[in-house]
């Protein structure tokens, strides 16, 4: 349906199931957790500053905005798409976070303790942590952030440019 989820307060809300609502998701406080991105329906996701969206797997096709953060948890793969402009950063606690384009990762820092796979674009975000970076796809990926990550860097295809 056309309904929406509005998460408020400082506690955690866990959303399950393959939901089909289209009115969007607003996280104004605390953490909204879902094992699979399909639990978020098809509307935009707005994450307020100091709020979090925690996901483990699936494909996040929703546009993500706001000052909040995305947390990738669990050992599975989460794929993010779209030109997302959330600014609270991204934390990868485990598993793999895949973005075909760097624009899908918002503008905040990326704390990586898992695997970050990026296809193309300019990754302006600061990348830190012990996790690895994998360049995928035939395109060109430019790293222009003030990076200090200690994990491996692997190029499976295309070109990786370290600009800073």
Predicted regions and their residues:
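Surface-exposed loop/turn positions within long extracellular repeat scaffolds
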Residues: 1, 12-67, 80-130, 143-164
């Amino acid at each position: 349906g056309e309904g929406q989820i509005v998460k408020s307060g400082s506690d955690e809300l866990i959303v399950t199931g393959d939901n089909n609502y289209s009115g969007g998701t607003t996280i104004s406080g605390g953490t909204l957790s879902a094992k699979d991105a399909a639990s978020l329906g098809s509307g935009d996701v707005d994450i307020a500053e100091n709020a979090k969206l925690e996901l483990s797997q699936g494909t996040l096709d929703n546009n993500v905005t706001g000052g909040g953060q995305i947390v990738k948890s669990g050992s599975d793969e989460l794929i993010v798409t779209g030109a997302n402009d959330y600014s609270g950063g991204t934390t990868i606690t485990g598993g793999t976070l895949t973005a075909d384009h760097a624009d899908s990762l918002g503008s905040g820092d990326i704390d990586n303790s898992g695997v970050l796979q990026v296809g193309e674009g300019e990754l302006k975000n600061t990348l830190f942590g012990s996790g690895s970076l994998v360049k995928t796809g035939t395109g060109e990926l430019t790293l222009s952030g003030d990076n200090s990550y200690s994990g491996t860097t692997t190029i499976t295809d295309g070109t990786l440019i370290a600009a800073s």
